[in-house]
């Protein structure tokens, strides 16, 4: 990744502008973060805290896929482990920015790394929660995962096109994560039948009845239409909010960006359904590959906002995924599905790691700072 002089200048001048309007953030988490911040030594780099949060969530993913691969029957210890690991991630995610301000070592590299880690953790959160809710690898899992991922992506899009990262009164980063932790803990304490009952059609019968009369069929789950309705409403309201803050030429760029994302999401849905009769591990690889490419796409949006140029980092794996999704619909290639998905996942993983490493090195060298440690020069350059 080569940067032109004007892009380096944009990188050095960039300052993160964020507003947390969430209720929990303002009245609870702010005090918790300040209390925890007093326990963190000044030599601990913000990116190290971010990395610790990522490690905790990767551990959560590994445990979930190992002990509940079907995402429908989590053992009690798994729910407790996911609660504790998410609590570690949540704490680190709140502390990294505060530590950067405390030590004067904030940078655009830190912002990009934090957003990149959060984009990975969005998928991991949806997988762990699907296990806790007992969704399985069903349409409920699919729509829930897409709801989490799309809403997360829209927050990044809003930052790119408006110049501000704004968390609403009820935000996924605060209330959403606390709800997820509460769900894991409740399942550990009350058992896995809790959410199976709460999300059943019998419990949600009023919703089932209303939507059955609207759709003319009852061949759906009530919780799926609730999630789907929330997804459509939040997506529409977010796009309208962004539009009001933009000029017309920028709107065309906005919708071309959204179109690429929707084509990718559509390919994921198609391939997920195509692989429904294949081995569990292949279905897992497809989900993880979707998460990798989604993360690259999200990081690309943040990166383009920071350096004022779209580097199109996502293009190779994006085109590969669309091609694989289309090719595997051919019946005579059915016996090669597992091989093609496995190879695609391997290539996507290699590309993902190389892109992440290249971005970190490029930004680090352009800014003249360290990545996982704090030096005197880091503070002076962050301040300048």
UniProtKB/Swiss-Prot annotation:
GO terms assigned for molecular function: CDP-diacylglycerol-serine O-phosphatidyltransferase activity
Location (main, coarse): membrane
GO cellular component, one term: membrane
Catalytic activity: a CDP-1,2-diacyl-sn-glycerol + L-serine = a 1,2-diacyl-sn-glycero-3-phospho-L-serine + CMP + H(+)
Subcellular location: Membrane
Pfam family, any one: CDP-OH_P_transf
Entry's Gene Ontology BP terms: phosphatidylethanolamine biosynthetic process
Pathway: Phospholipid metabolism; phosphatidylethanolamine biosynthesis; phosphatidylethanolamine from CDP-diacylglycerol: step 1/2
InterPro entries given in the database record: CDP-OH_P_trans, CDP-OH_PTrfase_TM_dom, CDP_ALCOHOL_P_TRANSF_CS, CHOPT
Enzyme Commission numbers on file: 2.7.8.8
Keyword annotations of the record: Lipid biosynthesis, Lipid metabolism, Membrane, Phospholipid biosynthesis, Phospholipid metabolism, Transferase
Topology term for the membrane: Peripheral membrane protein
Enzyme class name: transferase
Family under the similarity heading: Belongs to the CDP-alcohol phosphatidyltransferase class-I family.
UniProt name for this protein: CDP-diacylglycerol--serine O-phosphatidyltransferase
């Amino acid at each position: 990744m080569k940067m032109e002089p004007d892009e380096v200048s944009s990188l050095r001048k960039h300052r993160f502008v964020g507003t947390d309007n969430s209720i929990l953030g303002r009245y609870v988490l702010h005090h918790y973060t300040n209390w925890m911040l007093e326990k963190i030594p000044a030599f601990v780099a913000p990116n190290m805290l971010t990395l610790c949060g990522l490690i905790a969530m990767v551990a959560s993913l590994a445990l979930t896929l190992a002990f509940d691969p079907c995402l429908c029957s989590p053992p009690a210890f798994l729910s407790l482990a996911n609660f504790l690991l998410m609590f570690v991630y949540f704490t680190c995610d709140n502390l990294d920015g505060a530590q950067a301000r405390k030590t004067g070592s904030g940078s655009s590299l830190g912002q990009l790394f934090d957003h990149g880690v959060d984009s990975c953790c969005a998928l991991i959160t949806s997988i762990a929660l699907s296990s806790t809710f007992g969704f399985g690898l069903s349409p409920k899992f699919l729509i829930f995962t897409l709801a989490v991922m799309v809403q997360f992506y829209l927050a990044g899009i809003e930052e790119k096109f408006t110049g501000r990262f704004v968390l609403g009164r009820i935000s996924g980063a605060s209330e959403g994560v606390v709800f997820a932790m509460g769900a894991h803990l409740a399942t550990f304490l009350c058992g896995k039948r809790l959410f199976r009952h709460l999300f059943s059609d019998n419990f949600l019968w009023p919703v089932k009845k209303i939507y059955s009369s609207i759709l003319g069929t009852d061949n759906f789950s009530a919780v799926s239409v609730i999630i789907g309705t929330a997804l459509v409403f939040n997506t529409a309201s977010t796009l309208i909010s962004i539009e009001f803050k933009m000029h017309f030429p920028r709107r065309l760029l906005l919708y071309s960006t959204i179109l690429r994302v929707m084509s990718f999401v559509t390919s994921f849905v198609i391939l997920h359904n195509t692989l429904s009769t294949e081995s569990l591990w292949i279905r897992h690889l497809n989900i993880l590959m979707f998460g990798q490419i989604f993360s690259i796409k999200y990081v690309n949006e943040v990166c383009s906002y920071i350096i004022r140029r779209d580097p199109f980092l996502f293009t190779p794996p994006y085109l590969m995924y669309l091609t694989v999704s289309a090719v595997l619909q051919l019946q005579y290639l059915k016996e090669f599905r597992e091989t093609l998905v496995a190879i695609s996942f391997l290539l996507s993983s290699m590309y993902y790691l190389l892109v992440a490493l290249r971005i970190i090195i490029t930004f680090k060298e352009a800014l003249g700072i360290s990545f996982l440690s704090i030096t005197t020069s880091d503070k002076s350059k962050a301040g300048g």
